[in-house]
Amino acid sequence: MVSSETFKSCVWLSAAFVLAVAWAVPAAAKPQNPADLCIGAVAKQEAAHGIPRHLLRAISIAESGRWLRSRKATLAWPWTVTSGGKGTYYKSKSAAMRAVRKLQRRGVRNIDVGCMQVNLRYHPKAFKSLGQAFDPRANAAYAAGFLRKLRDDKRSWTQAVKHYHSATRSLNRPYHAKVYKIWRGERRKARKIQIANNRLQRQQARARFQHKRAERLLADNRFAARSQLWLDRASKRLFKQ
């Protein structure tokens, strides 16, 4: 028969496996947060243009960063419009586009838009339409290409970041300091996430091993139980004789 201690051990090992697998299963899908549009688009363009990891992300946060209480973080916001030094975060792409058109009807041309706050006055040919300007993929792609060109021209990522904002030294030096502070923070967070992921993978591997061990123990004990049952029946037949 299966001993109570062995049975408890098998149950515990199986439970550990189920718990580890549950950690790895994503929660039910939720509506995508607009900030995630910037995150995905920026990460893709960093890789495509050979930009140091998280640097373009840091610039996006410096440009259109918005504190999100639900995420407890400042993240780039795709529906951001800045004019006259004042940035406004809109709830939707359509609302942001209406705001830009309203500014343009008033004769305002110096307007920054989207995740990377591309300036419509200084980059008039960047996008085919205002709708494309607010497309996070197109916005990040143009900004990444512009930053890469600055890097190639200036031979320095430091200078590229400065000139992404302005060629004026008194303006670009504080901007560079701000971006690099954000960049250091983003790299620290990325390292912590990687460490946590590695730990989770080890826990899952350990749980899988324990689950297989539990299955073997259960199989062995089922065989032992069947053998014991056969012996009991054989003994009864012998006694009857």
What are the residue ranges of the model-derived segments?
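N-terminal secretory targeting signals
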Residues: M1-G50, K181-Q241
